[in-house]
Amino acid sequence: MRQLLPGDTAWRNIRLATMDPQQQTPYGLVDNLALIVREGLICDIVPKTQIPVSGDNIHDMQGRLVTPGLIDCHTHLVFAGSRAGEWEQRLNGVSYQYISAQGGGINATVSATRACAEDTLYLLAHERMMRLINEGVTLLEIKSGYGLELATEEKMLRVAAKLAAENAIDISSTLLAAHATPVEYHGDPDGYIALVCETIIPQLWKKRLFEAVDLFCESVGFSVAHSERVLQTAKALGIPVKGHVEQLSLLGGAQLVSRYQGLSADHIEYLDEAGVAAMRDGGTVGVLLPGAFYFLGETQRPPVELLRRYQVPVAVASDFNPGTSPFCSLHLAMNMACVQFGLTPEEAWAGVTRHAARALGRQATHGQLRAGFRADFVVWDAEQPVEIVYEPGRNPLYQRVYQGQIT
């Protein structure tokens, strides 16, 4: 019988989906186990017979399924305003160009976010974050990008920091100042990129308000040349990078980000084989965002077979944002990734655990249930992991554990 030390906590009689690729079973499934937590970390995983049936700090889960805490590695959940009205306009035949000319589109979100008080912005983001927490998310990425000026980009990142400080969740903050050209720089993307590179990135990095720099390399975003200047600026400061690339066209953004050893290349619907090879060589994770694909009515699917062939890790994320993916549900994103992009349920699970952790640079501590990893996990009223993917409208979450504490 295993002797627990003072302060240890054990979850026994569990079916563990470790998501450890070294396990030879689907999902890394092992039955009849006990998981021992010490000081917020997984101390050991042992047969359930080594742990007493009951006692202080012993939780008998009666054979329930346990998985790593979910990781949503791409969100834009700090914003103000709603774009529901313009979505209805588009469905009624009004062009996006007309809506944008009337102050709609991303500019509407930028205006609303700039005008929103920081406390109000926090409350809006907190409600959205709680929806993900209630699905079992324990690590969440949040991007800025609706400020497009120093003050509001900083305000958004402060909100993300406060969410992390005051709630039982890890947050990885990303600076996305190179999201779009703001109206005050209309026709002058060079001037705006200069502001991003010479002012916004270095000043906010000094305050350590973010962990990585992101950009939108696209025909309706920034050119390859502009994107490379952002990447050069970040790399000169030792900041990890990532990119929204190949969403609407093939510009070579994935190759560019991979040359800078980017953490991830996100969207990638128009990714070609050269881009896939570059991602493999750069150690860059491909992040699939099926919510945006669905909401925009796109038809070009990411090259999943190529990604498999080149053994590029594939993550899945909600991309929650007001303009192109108003779906604050990682369960739904997993289902969409299977139905629309052809992932297997096991690949979808890897995409919201170990591969999502890698996309955030957290692969040594998050995304798997192994000794030494963070004790962030979810207990489900389910027998198989596929159930969570199969029926996204039903949430069988039984217990969420963050740093070894039931939340």
Curated annotation (Swiss-Prot):
GO biological process, one term: L-histidine catabolic process to glutamate and formate
Residues where Fe(3+) binds: H74, H76, H244, D319
Intracellular or extracellular location(s): Cytoplasm
InterPro entries found in the cross-reference section: Amidohydro-rel, HutI, Metal-dep_hydrolase_composite, Metal_Hydrolase
UniProt remark on cofactor binding: Binds 1 zinc or iron ion per subunit.
UniProt GO molecular function: imidazolonepropionase activity; iron ion binding; zinc ion binding
Keyword Iron (UniProt): yes
EC number assigned by the record: 3.5.2.7
Pfam families membership: Amidohydro_1
Pathway in which the depicted protein is active: Amino-acid degradation; L-histidine degradation into L-glutamate; N-formimidoyl-L-glutamate from L-histidine: step 3/3
UniProt entry keywords in alphabetical sequence: Cytoplasm, Histidine metabolism, Hydrolase, Iron, Metal-binding, Zinc
Gene3D superfamilies given in the database record: Metal-dependent hydrolases, Urease, subunit C, domain 1
Positions annotated to bind Zn(2+): H74, H76, H244, D319
Main localization of the protein described in the UniProt heading: cytoplasm
Any single GO CC term annotated in Swiss-Prot or TrEMBL for this entry: cytoplasm
Catalyzed reactions: 4-imidazolone-5-propanoate + H2O = N-formimidoyl-L-glutamate
Residues the entry annotates as binding 4-imidazolone-5-propanoate: R83, Y146, H179, Q247, T324
Residues binding N-formimidoyl-L-glutamate, per UniProt: Y146, N321, G323
Essential cofactor(s): Zn(2+); Fe(3+)
Family, as annotated: Belongs to the metallo-dependent hydrolases superfamily. HutI family.
Its biological purpose: Catalyzes the hydrolytic cleavage of the carbon-nitrogen bond in imidazolone-5-propanoate to yield N-formimidoyl-L-glutamate. It is the third step in the universal histidine degradation pathway.
PANTHER family: IMIDAZOLONEPROPIONASE, IMIDAZOLONEPROPIONASE-RELATED
Protein name (database record): Imidazolonepropionase
Organism annotation: Salmonella arizonae (strain ATCC BAA-731 / CDC346-86 / RSK2980)
Taxonomic placement: Bacteria, Pseudomonadati, Pseudomonadota, Gammaproteobacteria, Enterobacterales
Gene responsible for this protein: hutI
